[in-house]
């Protein structure tokens, strides 16, 4: 922990609307999926579909037993919050499967790390186009309130679909800076749990990490916030993952960001 702004808050304090007070912080950096928009479950479902198709095909060829991708265990442990190709690598490593790296131009049919990642990307794009995106109401209210207080806001996401999701949810104009998978590739930034993308967003905003807040729902994300020595790391546990988020770097955990909204 660095600086006087980083504090461990108790449960009662964590629910106070002034947790994100203007005198303590200048900016709030939000993850996208599961924090701002209800797209985390869509990503998880697409990862499962893609990996299960690959694993089933592999099992048929090798004679190995087919063990499907588990959303509860595998998604949280190996994929959630990470850059797409990092997620592919980490999950395959957990199954002792080695594939060629390939390159980002690989077709979705290629049996490479990039090919599998591109296959998943095609799936999520199809879902976004057909079903649209809904933002979490409490999150939108909080972001608007923070901006009225003069605080800067950013989206920091591992997704290459970040801008499309923000536009579909009609919230793109609520953020001063966006650091996503596309930006990470261009700037050669390491993905979460490394703090690089959050640090890049804070730098673009002109705010030191100690004066910025990270808001995340993924284990890799809160780990990144802690590694970057940000002033406060807020975990969002919509499905009861509070203990895991606290154990991995969250200073406080809420079930929904509406808990941090000041009701005048």
Question: Residue ranges of each PLM-predicted region?
Answer:
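Substrate-recognition "cap/lid" segment bordering the active-site pocket of phosphatases
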Residues: 9-10, 133, 151-152, 160-213, ...
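Short acidic-hydrophobic, aromatic-tinged amphipathic segments that line or gate anion-handling sites
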Residues: 252-256
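N-terminal amphipathic/basic-hydrophobic helices that include classical n-h-c signal peptides
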Residues: 1-13
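Short amphipathic alpha-helix with an adjacent loop that forms part of the alpha/beta core around
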Residues: 19-20, 259-264
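Conserved SAM-binding loop
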Residues: 36, 135, 155, 214-215, ...
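N-terminal helical cap/lid subdomain that shapes the substrate entry/recognition surface
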Residues: 17-32, 36-137, 148
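Short glycine-rich donor-binding/catalytic loop of glycosyltransferases
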Residues: 237-240, 257
